[in-house]
Structure formats: C-alpha cells, structure tokens
Amino acid sequence: MLDKTRLRIAMQKSGRLSDDSRELLARCGIKINLQQQRLIAFAENMPIDILRVRDDDIPGLVMDGVVDLGIIGENVLEEELLNRRAQGEDPRYFTLRRLDFGGCRLSLAMQLDEAYTGPECLQNKRIATSYPHLLKQYLDRQSVNFKSCLLNGSVEVAPRAGLADAICDLVSTGATLEANGLREVEVIYRSKACLIQRDGEMPAEKQQLIDKLLTRMQGVIQARESKYIMLHAPSERLDEVIALLPGAERPTILPLAGDQSRVAMHMVSSETLFWETMEKLKSLGASSILVLPIEKMME
C-alpha cells in the first residue's frame, strides 16, 4: 500500500520516454534505483514514489487521482482526453510544463505508388492507427469520412496486409515507413513529453515539493539549452561579439594582463553555438574560444 503522504509520480516503465524521464529525475537530484524490474521505486532522499507503468495508463492514473504527477507524451495524453470526452466524462488535470525530450509527430502515410493531393484523398478510405480519436479529430475538421482500423502495434504492415488503405502513426525519422513501402503525406499532430498534475487540492507539503521539482527541472532544461562561453575579443568590437551570443544577462568582462586592446569575456548563451557562429566570432577578432556544457543552473 502506497503512503499517500508521499508524492507519487507515474512514468513509462520502458520505451521511448523511459530513459529520458529517468535521466531528468536523476539530474533533479532524486536518488532512486530504477535499474531493477520493480513497478514501484522509492526515492532515498525525498518523499517520492515512482510508479513505472505503460505509457497509455499514465493519463488515466493522473486524471483519476491515483498519482500526483505524470511524465507523458502529449500524443498519448490528448488521445486519452479525447477518448474520455467521447464517453461523456469531464477529465481534469494540469499541464505543469512541456519537457525537452520525446519529440515526435503523428502522421498520415500511404503506399509509395499512391497519389496524394490532400486529406480529401482519404475520403471513405480505411485507415489503420493506434490513435483513433486524434485521427478522427483531424479528419472531422477536414470534413473527410473514413473507416478506422484500430491496431495496437505494427501499424506499418496494415496496407501490405490488405487491412487498410493508409495508416496514421508516430513518426520520428521515417525509416520504418520507408522500410515498409510507405511515405509520410501529412502531419496531423506534433508532440513532446510533458509533466502533468492531478486536479484537486494538494497538501501544502506536496505542493512545496512539486514547486521545488519544477524549479530544478527548469534549471536542468535551461542548462541543456545553454552553453558557457569564454573567449578573448578586441575591446572596440565587443558589442558586435555580444550580439552574436544572446544570453539572459550581460557578460562578465575582464581585462587581459599586458594587453589593453583586448578583453576576456565569459557568458552563458542560450544560442545553440554552431560552427558558423564560431567562424563569425573569429572574423570579429575573437580568439581562444571555448564552448562548455552546463550541468545545472539557477537564475
């Protein structure tokens, strides 16, 4: 029996989001052993329990108040939301924040030799999918009638097997579609992982812990999106150099020993630093350019 005074978080047991969710919790300082095949794991340093479940069970666990928080793909969350609304329910939850992993898209795909000029091509066609409600929502908006073929896996084989004329499935790189003689023709939904919270009153201790976790998650995500930059630059071109490296705050400028025409600059930049940016910095006279990863940060 779970202790209801502890914060309960549901995450995917295995699969696309599992590794990223585990890494996020670890970088937030939650010490927990998720290596063993346990469905429930307990944090060593915080009053937190982790429930490891199937991804399509997570939205329901949050909406039904079984757990306090859930890390889930927006596609799975939206599908469950539409499913419950179709049954006359009024599901409640809060999306606390979008996360920086789990990116994918839900797309329509057809066989390579099939012509496609728009959603109207699918009029009265049979479409295989694991996301019938998201598919219906999209095609209803396009005024397209279709027949749904519900499959919980291996959706890509449906056209070759004669089960469907087209499919609607998650796409990451498109390699699986290509291997099955299919091509992506329409993106109907773009998704990332998100953190959701159950509806209803939350005890003050739990809410304080949630707020602490959100602050840490923000720091982890911001650190991953930022770099620590160190370089030497000509004093007269400093403004041009800074303009290439947007940051949350002004940089730290330090004098260089024995050289009054140049300075050392340190800053946290939110700009992804490509080779082109470094080449532009060099063309402005910058030298000794170092780009370092940031493990954690807090503003």
Swiss-Prot record:
Keywords: Amino-acid biosynthesis, ATP-binding, Cytoplasm, Glycosyltransferase, Histidine biosynthesis, Magnesium, Metal-binding, Nucleotide-binding, Transferase
The EC number(s) this enzyme carries: 2.4.2.17
Gene Ontology terms for molecular function: ATP binding; ATP phosphoribosyltransferase activity; magnesium ion binding
Pathways involved: Amino-acid biosynthesis; L-histidine biosynthesis; L-histidine from 5-phospho-alpha-D-ribose 1-diphosphate: step 1/9
Cofactor names: Mg(2+)
Annotated Gene Ontology cellular component terms: cytoplasm
Subunit structure comment from the entry: Equilibrium between an active dimeric form, an inactive hexameric form and higher aggregates. Interconversion between the various forms is largely reversible and is influenced by the natural substrates and inhibitors of the enzyme.
Family label: Belongs to the ATP phosphoribosyltransferase family. Long subfamily.
InterPro entries the record matches: ATP-PRT_HisG_long (IPR020621), ATP_PRibTrfase_cat (IPR013820), ATP_PRibTrfase_CS (IPR018198), ATP_PRibTrfase_HisG (IPR001348), HisG_C (IPR013115), N-reg_PII-like_a/b (IPR011322), N-reg_PII/ATP_PRibTrfase_C (IPR015867)
Subcellular location: Cytoplasm
NCBIfam families in the cross-refs: hisG, HisG_C-term
Catalytic activity: 1-(5-phospho-beta-D-ribosyl)-ATP + diphosphate = 5-phospho-alpha-D-ribose 1-diphosphate + ATP
Name this polypeptide is given: ATP phosphoribosyltransferase
Broad EC category: transferase
GO biological process, alphabetically ordered: L-histidine biosynthetic process
Species: Pectobacterium atrosepticum (strain SCRI 1043 / ATCC BAA-672) (Erwinia carotovora subsp. atroseptica)
Role noted for this protein: Catalyzes the condensation of ATP and 5-phosphoribose 1-diphosphate to form N'-(5'-phosphoribosyl)-ATP (PR-ATP). Has a crucial role in the pathway because the rate of histidine biosynthesis seems to be controlled primarily by regulation of HisG enzymatic activity.
Regulation of its function: Feedback inhibited by histidine.
